[in-house]
């Protein structure tokens, strides 16, 4: 699954990858815990931002 996702993720792919719900995904983006950007009303999440988030969480 992880290798099938491109370099830019959608909110749905983020949810599937991290096994989280939509509200949690939006909270992570809005708080800046996962760096992302919006094009219009659509969030775009760089895969590297998700990798960094996972590393920070597993390092604790």
Label every PLM stretch briefly:
Residues 24, 49-50:
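Short, well-ordered alpha-helical scaffold segment located
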Residues 18-44:
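Major-groove DNA-recognition helix of helix-turn-helix-type DNA-binding domains
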Residues 1-24:
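Polyanion-binding surface elements
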Residues 1, 50-60:
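A short, Lys/Arg-enriched interface patch at domain edges and termini
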Residues 13-16, 44, 59:
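Intrinsic disorder/low-complexity segments
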């Amino acid at each position: 699954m992880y290798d099938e996702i491109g370099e830019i993720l959608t909110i749905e792919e983020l949810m599937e990858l991290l096994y989280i719900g939509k509200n949690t995904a939006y909270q992570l983006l809005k708080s800046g815990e996962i760096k992302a950007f919006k094009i219009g009303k659509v969030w775009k999440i760089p895969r590297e931002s998700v990798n960094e988030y996972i590393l920070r969480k597993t390092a604790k």
